[in-house]
Amino acid sequence: MNLTILDTNLEPLAILDTYESLIWTDRYQAYGDFEIYESVRDDGLLSMLKQDYYLENTDSDHIMIIEQTQISSDTDSGNHLKISGRSLESLLERRIVWGQKILSGSFQNGVETLLNENIISPTDANRKIENFIFKASTDPYIVALK
């Protein structure tokens, strides 16, 4: 299983194809997660596995975001790196809605309004998450929700 390391602009930086352990869990109705366990090496890998960088798996439809990097040292087994995180949709947890917001209209329009005002094109440019888009659903059940 090959992983591509992506920077915050989703530009590929490197391929990660050797590791001691990889757990990659896709979930249907919850955030997926991953954990990589690898010995520390001198090929610059550590500098590319930064918090808020992304990992793309050739065997998955989900992109994961790196949330934690830990280095552990052991006299017997040497230095090891543990990288973990969750699937990209977990980014929505990082945003709050400022003030009270009253929504009217369809469910889909409400979701679009909240995403636009807090992630896609907020008034405070520091709150914007690049490359985040809203794609309206054509599913008749979603469109019919009020």
Predicted region positions:
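Charged- and aromatic-enriched interaction segments used to assemble
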Residues: 80, 86-146
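Assembly/oligomerization scaffold segments
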Residues: 1-105
